[in-house]
């Protein structure tokens, strides 16, 4: 059953394919018209790849890291006509860095929660407050202050209730 509510012509890159990615994908299919050849899922674990293969959606088995995210994501978000979109449903990927890249590429961005690169929470060289969720929230607000305007980025929309619930 489909109930198309929108059309998206650009590339869509979903980062992560755990429980939220698996729950969100069928809802995107139900409500958003998109070109499957421009949809790609990136995740370090391919245990659910069969769900993408049966939908003819491209899969890249790779972790998105601080060292590779620009090189990995830029061609995926700029390949072909239309503005790109990042759907970040992963952990251990810096939401702020990914938002900033999306902004650089004039791509939309959405995530369920603000995340840091691995190691922030356990970095003893930082104070407890510098390792807190409050500090992560402030880093998103700082990005907004430093780079006002531009294409929309939605952060911390939640998962379920949140991103999944919006589309049900």
Regions found by a protein language model. Give the residues of each.
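A short, basic/flexible loop-to-alpha-helix module at the beginning of a structural domain
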Residues: 1-10, 74
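Glycine-rich adenosine-cofactor-binding loop
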Residues: 11-26
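N-terminal Rossmann-like NAD(P) cofactor-binding module of classical short-chain dehydrogenase/reductase
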Residues: 83-88, 109-110
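Rossmann-fold NAD(P)-binding glycine/threonine-rich loop
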Residues: 93-108, 112-151
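Conserved anion/nucleotide-ligand pocket segment
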Residues: 150-167
């Amino acid at each position: 059953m489909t109930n198309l509510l929108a059309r998206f012509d650009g590339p869509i890159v979903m980062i992560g394919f755990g429980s939220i990615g698996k729950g969100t994908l069928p809802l995107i299919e139900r409500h958003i018209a998109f070109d499957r050849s421009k949809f790609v899922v990136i995740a370090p674990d391919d245990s659910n790849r069969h769900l993408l293969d049966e939908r003819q959606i491209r899969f890249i088995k790779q972790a998105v890291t601080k060292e590779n995210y620009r090189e990995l994501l830029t061609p995926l978000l700029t390949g072909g006509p239309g503005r790109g979109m990042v759907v970040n449903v992963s952990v251990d990927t810096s939401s702020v860095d990914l938002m900033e890249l999306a902004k650089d590429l004039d791509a939309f961005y959405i995530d369920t929660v603000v995340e840091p690169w691995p190691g922030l929470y356990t970095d003893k060289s930082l104070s407890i407050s510098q390792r807190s969720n409050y500090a992560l929230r402030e880093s998103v607000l700082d990005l907004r202050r430093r780079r006002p305007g531009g294409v929309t980025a939605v952060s911390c929309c939640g998962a379920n209730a949140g991103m999944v619930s919006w589309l049900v």
